[in-house]
Amino acid sequence: MSNLFAYSQVRRSRIVRQQQKQIKKAYEEALKEITKSVDKLYGKNDVSSSMRRVYLNKLKDDIQNQMNIVDGKTENIIKDNIGLMAEEVARNTQMYNSKIGLNAIVNSTSLKHRVVTNIITGKVYDGKFTLSSSIWGDNKRRLNEINRIIARDILQNKGVYDIAKDLERFVNPRARKDYDWSKMFPGSRRKIDYNAQRLARTMVSHAYQQAFVESTINNPFISAYKWITSGSNRVCPICIDRESTDQFGLGPGIFPKDRLPLDHPNGMCTFECVMAMNDEEIGEAIADWYLGEGDETMNDMIDRYVNDLKNF
């Protein structure tokens, strides 16, 4: 049988691409409002130090307000896409069941709720961080970077408008920040949306993996999972090792169903099912199950799988 979850893998790539555009758009909308505030400072380079402080504090507040809006949008975008990813895996599972002739209904609503909850609350990360703490923690770091840019520009005796233009460039998601930028403002990010995009990609990928495992862990026709690297030219050593090493005596890259490691941040690896039976054997097992005949242990396993899909 071909890759059972090829459909949801394709959907994951599309969700990630669409999500990237959604987050970029949120930053661009914020930039438009920030630019309005910056334009109001045109011609105000030659003001007293006290007035410079007043203008810059107002601009900083305007920027922070817009970034708060962006972060709120980003949090909602990620939540929505985690849920969408879980729904696509549920749909893929339903397609697979129909293909093998198993009349089992997948409770996509329950699966979606479970996956979204486990990821955004940090349960899947052993409580080390949550979606909200990640986003708003980065919000504080970004504000510190803004403060450092202002402080450095003041040390260079720049005027209000020139400082404002530097801040405008900092929050521009399409601005190119070269080596000179890093030299002028060490420690400030080159891409304003990088951390948000990284977090979003990571959580959608983890939603895919969690939904994949939840919907197959008790499938009696699947014996293990095989790790498949993304195939890009930037595959990390960890993923290469996971794909090529025989850690459990099952073959290179093959993991027991309860031992599949969580993909690392920004990862785009996928997983394939290792089948315990061929198509003909699966068909016979399902027929026996419908008729209440054949292997009782297998029938009990199919019962459990079907019930799990209904009651995630």
Predicted features and spans:
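N-terminal leader/targeting and assembly helices and adjacent pre-domain segments
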Residues: 1-184, 277-312
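Acidic, glycine-rich two-metal-ion catalytic cores of nucleic acid-processing enzymes
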Residues: 184-285
